[in-house]
């Protein structure tokens, strides 16, 4: 056992010694390897550092060489490249348009619809290697620059001689030419030989094709503008034409009056005396009924007569009512002229109600029996209020007031339920007639038509709308016209829509009622002292208001101004001086105007002063209105009659005070004339100023104007002539002249509209007379935009639109001249010398013919865009389906 143990122990010891020796050997080999690796890494680092130093030296040499050989800076190179890119784009675009038009011409001859337009290539202008290789494989491949000095120099020399951008553009042109030639060859192969010969002949004798294409494009734009302008002129609220001969109208009764025995027993001399006593009534016409003396002579139904006696408490008819009521109830058409506040409204309301009661009441959406048209919203509301006195107790008599500025949905709701009477303004009535293709409102049942304030309605230019409405009504209707004034030139127009009318004139035309006490306050100021004149009037107004309100604390006061701004300023002044006041004028919303009248008319509102423009001169009937003050004198006598006629109504007494300056001779002349006609006292100073004015008129230095001239009436014939001239130009004057018999029997349904002149785009070579200074143009063009529609003008002259056109065309565009309303003419026709007096126009100036032509093309496109928008709005407004 001991021997074995010793042997095993010896073996173990020897094994450990061997193991220790091998471990020492492996440790030595690892250290050597690590040392060798470190030495190799150090050598590699030294070599790498040496290579980097050499590379930096080479790069520095290359930079020095580049600086010495390349004199153009990097920014200049980029700028020149960008310019060449823009020129290439422009040339390519022109070439595409020319190619497109030529190819279209060829395909038209073949009568085969083929797509000839090329897809646009989206090209990245960043000339990176990846993008170039991926999108344009046919580009020339440039040699990659190395680190050698000689190679870099050679590459820079090549770059100077032939730029990479030029090579790129040239390669694209070559590819496009090849593709265009291929397409052209294919198209020509498909065309018959005869057509090809014709094309060759056209090329030989036709001149430059590009110029022809440009002229064709210009003529196309010109034709489009002309077409859209003509369409806009003829655009209106189209109503369905009605052939009355084909309609099966029911017969209706017109005559409801039987003359009383005591009236029929009177002799003609006695009748004339009665008319003289009734404010000197004058009648024109055949078989005119005699005037009534009391309400019982009319034999009205109880529901009407009870309202007159019990509610309105009218003891006897007024002068106009005495003659107009029996005439209208006899079925005659009437023209009634009487002073304001004389009861004209009741003169046609009573016959209309009697007329309606004799017929079957309207069912749902059958249309009204009576139609009353008024020029203003306020007058329409006043008429509705008068009718409601009779209809509140009778549920079968329904009335609807239709006017602009308020929601049309509520009006459509009322019409769908069925109404017997419509009171409205012409514009809104046409809207309702045209709405939903005529299914909202029709006038086939209408047999009684009233035009209140007819002269003002025609004078405001409502004649086309009124004629259009009357074409929708049966020809055997009964038509009545009433007004306080009736100029002689209106008589002919009124008789065109009436049949054998009876003219009734009470108290003379344009005469102030004798119940009104008139006073004129004269201020001795010159035309230059406007501020002083205004301050004097304000102080005088304060004195009058203070004294009058002390004597009449419950009386209402109406103050008229000429301008809307003056009305607002005067209200602010009165409120600051503790005078409760409110204003009404055309610049306010309909809700504000309605609220102002309601507050002013109310006895409990505490507001007794209303400041208004002439918008309140018609139809405003406020009880206890005792004083009218003309802060600004009216510019004609008819307006004065209507203004002061707001007081002294229904037999009550009234006062009217007018402020006027000695520097306003025309206004003084009108006031003196009105005072003479009403037999009032006249200040000698006023007569002196008026006589001087008459002397100047006789010498031709001044001119007398009357009525609302210049707002439509005087231009009606001129508008018709312009429209006829436009039709002759459009149709080459080849239409035969209309026969006189046809014009007498058939009334026109078209609405005369102002003639919209087509702008001219003539380019003139030379300097413009309007331009002064060293910078002058070589080409210019005047584009008259005065006669274009307002929204089209605004879209063209907007700063953004003009700036865009100026930037794209590199021209100068300025707005010159001044705006002239339709029908008016410039003071001088010489635009060359009087550019500031000419009609509103755009002056386009440029250094080249091409730039001016490009600017004109852009302006034409802007015109077309604006006309399209305007036509779309016109289409949506009148004929859209209203959703209730």
Swiss-Prot record:
Keyword Lipid biosynthesis: no
Major site of localization recorded for this protein: nucleus
Limits of the Helicase ATP-binding domain: 325-504
Class of this enzyme: hydrolase
GO MF annotation, one: nucleic acid binding
Biased composition, class Basic and acidic residues, residue ranges: 28-45, 58-67, 75-90, 173-188, 739-750
Substrates-to-products reaction catalysed: ATP + H2O = ADP + phosphate + H(+)
Sorted UniProt keywords: ATP-binding, Helicase, Hydrolase, mRNA processing, mRNA splicing, Nucleotide-binding, Nucleus
Residue numbers covered by motif DEAD box: 452-455
GO process annotations (BP): mRNA splicing, via spliceosome
Residue span(s) of domain Helicase C-terminal: 540-690
Biased composition (Acidic residues): 192-217
InterPro entries: DEAD/DEAH_box_helicase_dom, Helicase_ATP-bd, Helicase_C-like, P-loop_NTPase, PRP5/DDX46/KHDC4_KH, RNA-helicase_DEAD-box_CS, RNA_helicase_DEAD_Q_motif
Official protein name in the record: Pre-mRNA-processing ATP-dependent RNA helicase PRP5
Species this chain originates from: Candida albicans (strain SC5314 / ATCC MYA-2876)
């Amino acid at each position: 056992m001991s021997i074995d143990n010793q042997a095993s122990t010896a073996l173990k010891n020897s094994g450990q010694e061997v193991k220790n020796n091998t471990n020492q050997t492996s440790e030595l080999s690892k250290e050597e390897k690590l040392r060798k690796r470190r030495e190799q890494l150090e050598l590699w680092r030294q070599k790498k550092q040496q290579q980097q130093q050499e590379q930096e030296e080479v790069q520095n040499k290359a930079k020095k060489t580049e600086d010495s050989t390349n004199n153009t800076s990097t920014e200049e190179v980029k700028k020149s490249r960008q310019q060449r890119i823009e020129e290439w784009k422009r040339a390519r675009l022109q070439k595409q348009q020319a190619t497109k038009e030529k190819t279209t011409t060829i395909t038209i001859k073949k009568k085969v619809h083929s797509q000839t337009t090329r897809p646009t290539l989206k090209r990245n202008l960043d000339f990176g290697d990846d993008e170039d290789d991926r999108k344009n494989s046919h580009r020339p491949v440039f040699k990659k620059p190395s680190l050698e000095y000689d190679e870099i120099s050679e590459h820079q020399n090549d770059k100077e001689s032939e730029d990479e951008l030029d090579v790129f553009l040239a390669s694209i042109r070559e590819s496009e030419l090849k593709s265009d030639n291929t397409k052209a060859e294919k198209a020509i192969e498909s065309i018959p030989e005869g057509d090809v010969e014709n094309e060759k002949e056209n090329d030989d004798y036709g001149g430059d094709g590009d110029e022809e294409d440009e002229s064709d494009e210009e003529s196309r734009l010109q034709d489009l503008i002309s077409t859209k302008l003509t369409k806009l002129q003829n655009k209106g609220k189209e109503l369905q034409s009605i052939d009355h001969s084909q309609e099966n109208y029911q017969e209706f009764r017109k005559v409801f009056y039987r003359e009383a025995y005591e009236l029929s027993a009177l002799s003609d001399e006695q009748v004339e005396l009665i008319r003289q006593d009734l404010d000197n009534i004058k009648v024109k016409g055949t078989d005119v009924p005699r005037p009534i003396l009391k309400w019982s002579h009319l034999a009205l139904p109880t529901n009407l007569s009870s309202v007159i006696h019990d509610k309105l408490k009218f003891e006897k008819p007024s002068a106009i009512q005495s003659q107009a009521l029996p005439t209208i109830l006899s079925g005659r058409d009437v023209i009634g002229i009487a002073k304001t506040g004389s009861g004209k409204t009741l003169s046609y309301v009573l016959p209309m109600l009697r007329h309606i009661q004799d017929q079957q009441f309207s069912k749902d959406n059958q249309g009204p029996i009576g139609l009353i048209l008024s020029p203003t919203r306020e007058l329409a509301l006043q008429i509705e209020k008068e009718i409601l006195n009779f209809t509140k107790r009778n549920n079968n008599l329904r009335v609807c007031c239709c006017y602009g500025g308020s929601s049309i949905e509520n009006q459509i709701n009322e019409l769908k339920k069925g109404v017997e009477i419509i009171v409205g303004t012409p514009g809104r009535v046409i809207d309702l007639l045209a709405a939903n293709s005529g299914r909202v409102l029709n006038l086939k049942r209408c047999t009684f038509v009233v035009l209140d304030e007819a002269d003002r309605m025609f004078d405001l230019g409502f004649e086309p709308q009124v004629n259009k409405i009357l074409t929708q009504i049966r020809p055997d209707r009964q038509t009545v016209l009433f007004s306080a004034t009736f100029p002689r030139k209106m008589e002919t127009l009124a008789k065109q829509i009436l049949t054998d009318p009876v003219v009734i004139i009470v108290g003379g035309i344009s005469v102030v009622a004798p119940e009104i006490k008139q006073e004129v306050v004269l201020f001795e100021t010159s035309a230059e002292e406007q501020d002083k004149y205004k301050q004097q009037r304000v102080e005088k107004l304060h004195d009058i208001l203070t004294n009058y309100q002390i004597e009449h604390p419950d009386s209402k006061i109406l103050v008229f101004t000429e301008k809307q701004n003056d009305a607002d300023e005067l209200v602010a002044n009165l409120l600051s001086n503790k005078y409760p006041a409110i204003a009404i004028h055309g610049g306010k919303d309909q809700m504000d105007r309605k609220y102002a009248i309601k507050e002013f008319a109310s006895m409990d509102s505490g507001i007794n002063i209303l400041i208004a423009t002439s918008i309140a001169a018609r139809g405003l009937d406020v009880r206890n209105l005792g004083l009218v003050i003309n802060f600004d004198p009216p510019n004609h006598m008819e307006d004065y009659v209507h203004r002061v006629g707001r007081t002294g109504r229904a037999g009550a007494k009234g006062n009217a005070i007018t402020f006027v300056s000695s520097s306003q001779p025309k206004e003084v002349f009108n006031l003196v004339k009105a005072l003479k006609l009403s037999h009032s006292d006249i200040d000698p100073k006023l007569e002196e100023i008026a006589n001087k004015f008459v002397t100047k008129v006789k010498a031709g230095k001044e001119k007398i104007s009357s009525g609302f001239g210049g707002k439509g009436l005087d231009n009606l014939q001129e508008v018709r002539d312009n429209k006829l001239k436009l039709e002759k130009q459009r149709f080459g004057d080849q239409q035969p002249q209309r026969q006189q018999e046809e014009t007498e029997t058939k009334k026109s349904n078209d609405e005369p509209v102002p003639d919209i002149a087509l702008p001219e785009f003539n380019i003139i070579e030379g300097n413009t007379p309007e331009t002064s200074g060293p910078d002058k143009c070589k080409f210019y063009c005047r584009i008259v935009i005065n006669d274009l529609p307002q929204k089209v003008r605004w879209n063209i002259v907007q700063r953004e639109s003009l700036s865009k056109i100026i930037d794209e065309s590199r021209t100068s565009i300025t707005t010159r001249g001044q705006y002239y309303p339709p029908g008016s003419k410039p003071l001088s026709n010489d635009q060359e010398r009087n550019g500031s007096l000419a009609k509103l126009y755009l002056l386009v100036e440029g250094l080249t013919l091409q730039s001016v032509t490009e600017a004109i093309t852009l302006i034409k496109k802007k015109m077309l865009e604006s006309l399209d928008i305007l036509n779309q709005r016109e289409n949506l407004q009148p004929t859209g389906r209203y959703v209730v």
